[in-house]
Design a protein with these regions (language model features):
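Acidic, divalent-metal-binding catalytic cores of TOPRIM
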Residues: 1-167
Length: 167
């Protein structure tokens, strides 16, 4: 039972996934965190995570960085840039030129701030009017391979829903 509701629990493991949504910094700039960086969440659901997790059957799994799409771009920049380039409406324009530079990095980043900039670029173009999350998701699903890195919070959410265990 959640937030004082009454009645029987449904004995099924249920995972929730939510974005961290770090918001803006003191200069009013949207935050795009670097990999493995702690950031404060502005998502109100995160504040009730402990309450959700206290139920036998429910767990809330929160993005450690920003959003689902941003996190995937942080862990898989080459693949996401490749997919985005394949569906971008102007293949010879500046967007595809920048995506080529990201692809050429071969996921090899010693500078985490550059990785964050590239993930931001990918994220902003996925969210653009030219593409959109839904179209991008379908294109990405066609290209996922065994070496695709699934962030731990997503893996743990799936594992929890399948039997109440995590990594």
């Amino acid at each position: 039972n959640f937030q004082g509701s009454s009645g029987p629990d449904i004995p099924i493991f249920c995972s929730g996934l939510t974005d961290r949504d770090p918001g803006k910094d003191d200069s009013d700039n949207v935050i795009y965190p670097e990999k493995d960086t702690e950031v404060e969440s502005k998502n109100p659901v995160v504040s009730i995570k402990d309450e959700i997790d206290s139920n036998t059957w429910t767990r809330l799994f929160v993005s450690p960085l920003k959003t689902f799409e941003y996190d995937l771009a942080t862990y898989n920049p080459k693949l996401l840039a490749t997919v985005l380039k394949s569906i971008w409406p102007t293949p010879n324009g500046t967007v595809c030129t920048k995506l080529d530079k990201i692809i050429a990095k071969e996921n090899s980043y010693s500078d985490m701030s550059l990785l964050a900039k590239h993930a931001k670029y990918i994220y902003e173009h996925i969210e653009s009017d030219e593409i959109g999350k839904g179209v991008f998701a379908y294109a990405l699903a066609e290209k996922i391979t065994d070496d695709f890195i699934v962030p731990n919070y997503i893996s743990n959410a799936v594992l929890w829903a399948c039997g109440g265990k995590t990594l």
